[in-house]
């Protein structure tokens, strides 16, 4: 099982590709890994923000998920910052966020 530090380091090493190829403006972890409550079965919850003028297509978004799963070796649940509409869900996620 990967540690939070290992995951952050992997994401940092791939930051240029994430920005240049996948148009990621910012990336943050939340959920069980961010809270230190992960188990062997845990996936990793990631929130990304894209540049307003350079939003990826749906297929590019799916490619990003596949890329993250490949480099992390974990199942990834990916959301965008703009996709959180429920204020209670947003608050809960924001409490966990660890930006990379």
Swiss-Prot record:
Name of protein: Putative protein adenylyltransferase MJ1379
Species name: Methanocaldococcus jannaschii (strain ATCC 43067 / DSM 2661 / JAL-1 / JCM 10045 / NBRC 100440)
Magnesium is among the record's keywords: yes
Cofactor(s) for this UniProt protein: Mg(2+)
Pfam families: NTP_transf_2
Function per UniProt: Probable antitoxin component of a putative type VII toxin-antitoxin (TA) system. Neutralizes cognate toxic MJ1380 by di-AMPylation.
UniProt entry tagged with the keyword Membrane: no
Catalytic activity: L-tyrosyl-[protein] + ATP = O-(5'-adenylyl)-L-tyrosyl-[protein] + diphosphate; O-(5'-adenylyl)-L-tyrosyl-[protein] + ATP = O-[5'-(adenylyl-(5'->3')-adenylyl)]-L-tyrosyl-[protein] + diphosphate
């Amino acid at each position: 099982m990967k540690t939070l530090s290992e995951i952050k380091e992997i994401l940092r090493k791939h930051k240029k590709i994430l920005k240049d190829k996948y148009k990621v403006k910012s990336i943050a972890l939340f959920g069980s890994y961010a809270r230190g409550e992960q188990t062997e079965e845990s996936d990793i919850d990631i929130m990304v923000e894209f540049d307003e003028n350079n939003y990826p297509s749906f297929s590019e978004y799916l490619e990003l998920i596949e890329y993250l799963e490949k480099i992390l070796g974990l199942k990834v649940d990916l959301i965008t910052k703009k996709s959180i509409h429920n204020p209670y869900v947003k608050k809960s996620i924001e409490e966990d966020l660890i930006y990379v």
